[in-house]
Swiss-Prot record:
Taxonomic source organism: Shewanella sp. (strain ANA-3)
Gene: dxs
Cofactor requirement: Mg(2+); thiamine diphosphate
Stated name of the protein: 1-deoxy-D-xylulose-5-phosphate synthase
Matches recorded under NCBIfam families: dxs, PRK05444.2-2
Coiled-coil parts of chain: none
Amino acid sequence: MSLDISQFPVLAQANTPNELRQLPQALLPQLADELREFLLKSVGMSSGHFASGLGTVELTVALHYVYNTPFDRLIWDVGHQAYPHKILTGRRDRMHTIRQKNGLHPFPWREESEYDTFSVGHSGTSISAALAMAVAAEKEQAGRKVVAVIGDGAMTGGMVFEAMNHAGDLHNDMLMVLNDNEMSISENVGALNNHLAQLMSGRLYTTIRESSKKVLKGMPVIKEMAKRTEEHLKGMVVPGTLFEELGFNYIGPIDGHDVDALVETLRNMRSLKGPQVLHIMTKKGRGYEPAEKDPIGWHAVPKFDPSQFKKPATKPGLPTFSQVFGKWLCDIAEQDEKVLGITPAMREGSGMVEFSQRFPKQYFDAAIAEQHAVTLGAGFACEGFKPVVAIYSTFLQRGYDQLIHDVALQRLPVLFAIDRGGIVGADGPTHQGAFDLSFMRCIPNMVIMAPSDENECRQMLYTGYCYDAGPSAVRYPRGSATGATQVEAMTALPIGKGVIKRLGKGIAMLNFGTTLAAALTAAESLDATVVDMRFVKPLDVDLVKEMAQTHDVLVTVEENAIMGGAGSGVLELLQKLKMPKPVLQIGLPDEFIKHGSPEEVTHDLQLDAEGMLAQINAFLAD
């Protein structure tokens, strides 16, 4: 159910950027207030990313007011902060469907709107995309402008600096807006800096600056003195030296919540030549006190009533797999001070908060730099430490070369705790953990484990900790564990050995991971054998051979892409053993998995017990 737009009289007049640009500038502050209120209420109805969007309301209004979108290109980095953008670009009445099945995509998405010029989900991509669009605009002589909006958190990723280095060299016209919400706005980032930014972006300053360069072109000594003087004067009031060194003209910082100042500064910058940086200071969660005080806790929210100023109380329930990992990490760190925990900016999501607090000298946050996080683990392993890299499946993709070249090639004992393996749900195709078993299985020297419940997860983590002949990975899903009885003792599992969970006849289901419960349910109707394979690599050769010899049909089950996954490993083994056998592979199809609740996606892909049974019966009927 959408909100009553009559409660937002100015926002009602700005359903698209064209309508927004018809408004008098004097109404923009009221528009920003209404947009923020609309965002509060709509996310409360739908759930979703919350605090980031509250901090970009004024910026979003100003960008669409000054730039001729979608002709002018606007690229959002990651997209957590793009909810206001969606509201102002014709999707206002569908905001209550965001992140839901058949609803709006959680991030900017090209297929969804012409205003979403680049599909995003992983951080650090906006500058590269914007540079390409700026080069294309110049080649086509289109006269269009290009703007990328990137947060200070994404600036920790190396790809951003690679792109900036290239942009500074090519010198195409483009604007990079640095949305800095690391700290609250201080007195120095008020009227004085807003005035300074407008002066520095104005025609007079730019003309004098460029004319001086031409005059001094033939006098290198004087030119260098002038350059240093300019840097010294600017350095006293703006922290832009790094950007200037990379070839960008730096302007700011300015108050990112002063919509009039943003409009005037952006108007001035719109005509500037070459790559530009506008540094704005914002407050994540702006306008909603609980989110301002705890922007991390309010980064994303379930459905809630904003008027209550608190999120709904969570009912006591099963621990998540992330929490199971976090507890194990603390337990093992108590025993071994050489255990080091590494995360690429996912402390909360990966369950490492307690570990970071109790063992601060053993905790390393590599920031949004997955390549660095993986090789950091490799370096620690070289020196005799026990590195544990906690990383989401979708983000491990970004450190793939390092996994191969820096870890596996050297047989270094780095343990990868891979969270969010399989179906993630509402965040959609950019965040589903669909490919990790496939891209790890082909790497020599890797040991890959897939626990069926929280106890196996704990024992497998300990197995990886004890394994010193090379890298190992334990891959587990998002969300609550299965409810298995907790076993505190830690025992290393025999490498490459599975266990039979149910003896049947005719059909043997070889299960990899937490789909075991559904497989056991489906097996009851079929009187099938069910095997908890535990290890994706190395496979239990003897057990697979036994199942092939004693059953008519094999069924592999995994929450990973069928192509190249665990089931493919079983087929390869059967071929090697020269044992032809009908094999049905149940897993994720050859497509990007859309957003929806995990339960909806699992059902649609026939990965629940009902779906498995239907797939097996269809296979037998052919």
